[in-house]
Amino acid sequence: PGSTAGMELSLLRSFEPPDAAVLEDAELFAGKVEGTASGLLGLLGIAADALRSREHLLLSQILSQAWASGKGLDLAAIIGAIQEPPFEKVGVIELETFYPKKDRSDLAVAVNALLASPAAAGWARGEALDVARLLRTTEGKPRVSIISIAHLSDAQRMFFVTLLLDEVLSWMRRQSGTSSLRALLYMDEIFGYFPPTAAPPSKRPMLTLLKQARAFGLGIVLATQNPIDLDYKGLSNC
């Protein structure tokens, strides 16, 4: 992602709605919305609390409403929705009281700066993030896909890893249960993505995968130089 080396992967082409299996599971759907909103705000340098930040709550409601109606959003559409949201209230509070238009314009400008940045052009190029295509060729043959994020900034890495794990989770939900190994997800240098105390956007989908993946034939291998950096809830599922 964000590089011309190897096979390019698009990060920002579009935020497509999740599969039916995720849409029908309230917990998974809420988690996907939260992770996407947190990752995008992280790219903007906004450390947003999912329960208290008005930026996070506004963006989450925009994504949730669009995805629930089956619509995907690109960054341009998100900017438009921030400026003129397709709803009048956030919770029970009037939109203009909760997040005045002038303040929303500041957020829209920040997202637009991300869209206009030279790096964004690289993120928009390449194939869409499709786990099925990463695991198998168009002829159906298994393959190994190695994704390099060493060239990305910390915020960009977190954003991409969160998107990738959510896509793996969606792909997993489409599979039938099996006791055989169907696929393997290996992640090196897990430090910072699954910490014992903090809750970065990548932690939620990773914990869900560690709890449920084996039932769908998905194996997970995490590598770190210091196991104490991993949340014990994940280690208990090994």
Annotate each predicted stretch with a short phrase.
Residues P1-K211, A215:
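P-loop NTPase motor domains
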Residues T208-N237:
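Conserved ATP-driven motor cores of ASCE-family P-loop NTPases powering translocation/secretion/packaging/pilus
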